[in-house]
Amino acid sequence: MPNQHMLMLFNMLPVGSNISTWWNFGSMLLTCSALQTITGFFLAIHYTANINLAFSSVIHITRDVPYGWIMQNLHAIGASMFFICIYIHIARGLYYGSYLNKNVWLSGTILLFILMATAFFGYVLPWGQMSFWAATVITNLLTAVPYIGTTLTNWLWGGFSINDPTLTRFFALHFILPFTIISLSSIHIMLLHTEGSSNPLGTNSDIDKIPFHPYHTHKDILVLTIMLTTMFIIMTLTPNIFNYPENFSKANPLVTPQHIKPEWYFLFAYGILRSIPNKLGGTVALVLSVAILLTTPFTHTSHMRSMTFRPLTQLMFWTLVATFITITWAATKPVEPPFTMIGQMTSLLYFSFFIMNPLLGWLENKISFTNT
């Protein structure tokens, strides 16, 4: 009987009738999370967290373990799919004013930080050339912290350089953090259901709600099928599309790659980091590139929640999307003109969105309500 009540609660959950496909990305993220946890568990069974054996153990998984190549490729492609979904999920939140549900937005931003940390630790685990050098560059940023920077870095490394203790603790963190993500996701969903979802119009949905099942469950199943089909097509035809050639060589501390870069989903933050020719300034900008999302609920000035009827803000939003893509592209290029200038200009544009948004909201209020 209690199970039936739980099922009824899920089935009869009232949801606004006009929410679009952009609201399906939450369930897609939940599926990605489940997929990553399952594939990650099976990979962890065969992985060895040792600097001499890590690279060989990954090769062993793909070559010798039954269906190991599926697990390894699904885990790698799943990470990229996770970030594609989360960036679209955040973009939808910015466009439709979902950030005004403060608790949900703030818990979601904390989730993003933990997710990025988890993905970074996971990128180091294969102990390839790019894994090692990306870890060296990014962890070295801690030395920019005044007074305690060097101590913090040595504490994280477990010594005076990246070595076996570093890999062991990164593996431990990469294993434990997904469970933190699952716990926080539960809180995120619980907080969402106390107030309910917004909708494309930004109005109150109470006047027109429909049951979650069958309407939205069928919508969810459709997008999940598309996502999983895409993942399997990539896995079978071009499994290494998101990988860098340098990472197919074992880590060598004596040979520095020509161009050090993290995975594609961190390139926007990496582009902002390297556009500032100062270590501390770059590190602060790197953290702010994500932390600035925390400010949006407190800087909203428009009388309208959604951007649906706000053409000026829409223009600024699509500029932000173009800026995000341009920073990502520029960060893949060497640190030389014109890429440094492009990186600096796009970084400036990226942060200007969060300054212009409240100003444009105020201006649109003036224009819209002049004659009322």
From Swiss-Prot:
Q: Where does heme b b562 bind?
A: 75, 174
Q: Which compartments does it reside in?
A: Mitochondrion inner membrane
Q: Which GO CC terms are listed, alphabetically?
A: mitochondrial inner membrane; respiratory chain complex III
Q: What keywords would UniProt list here?
A: Electron transport, Heme, Iron, Membrane, Metal-binding, Mitochondrion, Mitochondrion inner membrane, Respiratory chain, Transmembrane, Transmembrane helix, Transport, Ubiquinone
Please share the entry's free-text remark on the cofactor. Binds 2 heme b groups non-covalently.
Major localisation? mitochondrion
Q: What is the disulfide pattern of this chain?
A: none
Record's CDD domains? Answer: cytochrome_b_C (cd00290), Cytochrome_b_N (cd00284)
List the transmembrane segments.
25-45, 69-90, 105-125, 170-190, 218-238, 280-300, 312-332, 339-358
- Family annotation (SUPFAM superfamilies): a domain/subunit of cytochrome bc1 complex (Ubiquinol-cytochrome c reductase), Transmembrane di-heme cytochromes
Q: Which Pfam families match?
A: Cytochrom_B_C (PF00032), Cytochrome_B (PF00033)
Enumerate the GO terms in the molecular function aspect: metal ion binding; ubiquinol-cytochrome-c reductase activity
Where does the chain bind heme b b566? 89, 188
Q: Which InterPro entries match?
A: Cyt_b/b6_C (IPR005798), Cyt_b/b6_C_sf (IPR036150), Cyt_b/b6_N (IPR005797), Cytb/b6-like_sf (IPR027387), Cytochrome_b (IPR030689), Cytochrome_b_C_euk/bac (IPR048260), Cytochrome_b_N_euk/bac (IPR048259), Di-haem_cyt_TM (IPR016174)
Write out the residues that bind a ubiquinone: 193
Its needed co-factors are: heme b
Topologically, how does it sit relative to the membrane?
Multi-pass membrane protein
Do you know which Gene3D superfamilies this protein is assigned to? Cytochrome Bc1 Complex, Chain C
**What quaternary arrangement does the UniProt entry report?**
The cytochrome bc1 complex contains 3 respiratory subunits (MT-CYB, CYC1 and UQCRFS1), 2 core proteins (UQCRC1 and UQCRC2) and probably 6 low-molecular weight proteins.
Protein function: Component of the ubiquinol-cytochrome c reductase complex (complex III or cytochrome b-c1 complex) that is part of the mitochondrial respiratory chain. The b-c1 complex mediates electron transfer from ubiquinol to cytochrome c. Contributes to the generation of a proton gradient across the mitochondrial membrane that is then used for ATP synthesis.
Anything else known: Heme 1 (or BL or b562) is low-potential and absorbs at about 562 nm, and heme 2 (or BH or b566) is high-potential and absorbs at about 566 nm.
What is the protein's given name? Cytochrome b
Query: Which species is this record about?
Result: Lycodon semicarinatus
The organism's taxonomic lineage, starting at the top: Eukaryota, Metazoa, Chordata, Craniata, Vertebrata
Gene this chain is encoded by:
MT-CYB
